[in-house]
Amino acid sequence: MIVTETIIRFENVTKQFDNDPPVLDNVSFEIEKGKFYTLLGPSGCGKTTILRLIAGFLEASEGQIYLGDKVINQIPANKRPVNTVFQDYALFPHLNVYENVAFGLRIKKLKKDAIDKKVQEALRFVNLKGYEKREISEMSGGQRQRVAIARAIVNEPEVILLDEPLSALDLKLRTEMQYELRDLQKRLGITFIFVTHDQEEALAMSDEIFVLNKGEIQQSGTPIDIYDEPINKFVADFIGESNIVNGKMIQDFEVEFVERRFECVDQGFRPNEVVEVVIRPEDLEITSAEKGKLQVTVDWMLFRGVHYEVGCIDIDGNEWLVHTTRKVRVGDKIGLAFEPEAIHVMRLGETEEEFDKRLDSYDEVQ
């Protein structure tokens, strides 16, 4: 049995500025020690506010924030065992790499030998050994990020907070840094809490993801759970690309949409309950119109390098996106084939607690 330790806990936390609507609205969650977490959502969803509340840069309007079993609402930022890596890295341009990393240790008035040992170890962890005397202006974007991370880990925090640190990098470097950050977190064993609006970053790097919208956590779970079992239309649409249509759950394992009934793997709904149905573009296969489970007309097509994106319209006017290596022509009448496992049925207005209970009931039946 694996024993997990909760390091951060939010209990009914609300953050409101003046008389504006809450930026965070009665949010509760737990962060376990030694994992890589991502707060994911669009601009203004509250993800950076959570980070600032943990860091101590903001104070909660309501609710309690715990570090371990201790309430930290009133503890100032400089007394909390957390360090933040900012979007612009916040490095000192007049200091070289070594002095940037050593800055916090000098503030703590550590002895010179202790500072040197910690700085050298931190630089080794981020693969910057030998860059001690390099000026910040001479560093690339990826190298500057590693300096910022070294400065964060040198203080041996319990938690590292990362506020969209990859957003300023080009695509190739951003991908490389995703692997580096994930590897670094595993080697350090420190809890990382990463903020991003990029769902691909979140899926690639995280042990756990919190999906936020309008100040509320919509869903939390592993990347695979959230991608394969989105709780609602927002999550399904925000995490990857989705085809979402209205449907009706006829009975367990049978759903109706686009005027036809299909076998599925979902259960626990009321007979004839109105639902929303999700099928991912990569789970659709183009066939002849006669062989397809759905008949559609090709509306547009784009070449994406590794595959084509094909947009189609069904008889009800629903739009369908397909990822395929098969080339078709605009105006073609084609069929779409898919397996029962490709269908995901979502209950309207279901809370995360209700959703989790329904998924647990699947396991009990199986």
Curated annotation (Swiss-Prot):
Keyword Protease attached: no
PROSITE patterns reported in the protein's UniProt record: ABC_TRANSPORTER_1, ABC_TRANSPORTER_2, POTA
UniProt-listed Pfam families: ABC_tran, TOBE_2
Localisation: Cell membrane
Top-level lineage group: Bacteria
UniProt domain ABC transporter: residue ranges: 8-239
Keywords, alphabetical: ATP-binding, Cell membrane, Membrane, Nucleotide-binding, Translocase, Transport
UniProt-annotated binding residues for ATP: G41, P42, S43, G44, C45, G46, K47, T48
Major place of residence: membrane
Keyword hit for Transferase: no
Membrane topology: Peripheral membrane protein
Catalyses which reaction(s): ATP + H2O + polyamine-[polyamine-binding protein]Side 1 = ADP + phosphate + polyamineSide 2 + [polyamine-binding protein]Side 1
InterPro entries cross-referenced by the UniProt entry: AAA+_ATPase (IPR003593), ABC_SmlMolc_Importer (IPR050093), ABC_transporter-like_ATP-bd (IPR003439), ABC_transporter-like_CS (IPR017871), Mo/tungstate-bd_C_term_dom (IPR008995), NA-bd_OB-fold (IPR012340), P-loop_NTPase (IPR027417), PotA_ATP-bd (IPR017879)
Protein EC: 7.6.2.11
Gene3D superfamilies the UniProt entry points to: 2.40.50.100, Nucleic acid-binding proteins, P-loop containing nucleotide triphosphate hydrolases
GO cellular component labels: ATP-binding cassette (ABC) transporter complex
Signal peptide: none
GO molecular function: ABC-type putrescine transporter activity; ATP binding; ATP hydrolysis activity
Primary role: Part of the ABC transporter complex PotABCD involved in spermidine/putrescine import. Responsible for energy coupling to the transport system.
Similarity section: Belongs to the ABC transporter superfamily. Spermidine/putrescine importer (TC 3.A.1.11.1) family.
PANTHER family noted in UniProt: SPERMIDINE/PUTRESCINE IMPORT ATP-BINDING PROTEIN POTA, SPERMIDINE_PUTRESCINE IMPORT ATP-BINDING PROTEIN POTA
UniProt subunit comment: The complex is composed of two ATP-binding proteins (PotA), two transmembrane proteins (PotB and PotC) and a solute-binding protein (PotD).
Protein's UniProt name: Spermidine/putrescine import ATP-binding protein PotA
Taxonomic source organism: Listeria innocua serovar 6a (strain ATCC BAA-680 / CLIP 11262)
